[in-house]
Amino acid sequence: MVEKRDVEREDKFNLTVDVLMLAGTLLLQSGSEIYRVEDTMIRIAHSQGIMDCNALAMPVAIFFSIENTNISRMKRITHSNYNIEKVCDVNQVSRELVSGDITLEEAFEKLAQLKKKKAPYTNKQLTLAAT
């Protein structure tokens, strides 16, 4: 029989993975360095007591797994651009979560809002600026 404590633990693990995967996705889509994506994901996991974990980021995908559990995720990155403002915003949310200033739920909500945030420049503006 599965104990309530085990279910709560797995729910927390899943929420943590949701948060760090969203953070990693936003960072990678916004042009962040690969090492920063992996480091952010690991720091978020460690802040929630998940020490035995693996994060792997590539330009086209991110992977995360927790040792000795059946929890693992993969996210394919289909488009990206350079949005340093969004990278800074995601890093700020990560810092607030790791320092304990916000909860997992608050971090997820902030990241979800950042995901909806429009790029500061349109493709047309970028093209005109480059010429």
Regions found by a protein language model. Give the residues of each.
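Soluble N-terminal domains of membrane-associated systems
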Residues: M1-I102
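Non-transmembrane, extramembrane segments of multi-pass ion/lipid transporters
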Residues: T103-L111
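Cytosolic juxtamembrane amphipathic/interface segments immediately preceding
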Residues: K110-K118
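Core alpha-helical transmembrane segments of integral membrane proteins
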Residues: A119-T131
